[in-house]
Amino acid sequence: MAKPGTRTRKKVKKTVVDGVAHIHASFNNTIVTITDRQGNALSWATSGGSGFRGSRKSTPFAAQVAAERAGNAAAEYGLKNLDVLVKGPGPGRESAIRALNACGYKITNITDVTPIPHNGCRPPKKRRV
């Protein structure tokens, strides 16, 4: 039982003006994370967590919904400007950026940070359908 004299402090939301949107677009899913400049996560959303399952997870519309959810959750911190870092070859790259722009953020920079191997791991075998 809590002591009657102790009070817990109310958690103060920090205000962040500039943020970074990390979009990881794989062939199966899209993950959108919005952080501050130091890399501390403010909000995140995924296509799978937005209610899409199976092959619908990897559609541009699912990436758009995930970006809208992450953008609306990050709006509580007072974000105005976003740098966008896009990683991966997935189908949700473009639509996630457009959805963040539609949320009212000023996108200052778009950077592709897809890791490119210098002939590293062997790629998966080609599909035969």
Swiss-Prot record:
Keywords noted in UniProt: Ribonucleoprotein, Ribosomal protein, RNA-binding, rRNA-binding
Gene3D superfamilies: Ribosomal protein S11
Coiled coil, from the record: none
Record's keyword annotation contains Translocase: no
One Pfam family this sequence matches: Ribosomal_S11
Keyword Secreted in annotation: no
GO function term, MF aspect, one: structural constituent of ribosome
GO cellular component entries: ribonucleoprotein complex; ribosome
GO biological process: translation
Complex and partners: Part of the 30S ribosomal subunit. Interacts with proteins S7 and S18. Binds to IF-3.
Purpose of the protein: Located on the platform of the 30S subunit, it bridges several disparate RNA helices of the 16S rRNA. Forms part of the Shine-Dalgarno cleft in the 70S ribosome.
Family in the record: Belongs to the universal ribosomal protein uS11 family.
Stored HAMAP family: Ribosomal_uS11 (MF_01310)
Name of protein: Small ribosomal subunit protein uS11
Gene: rpsK
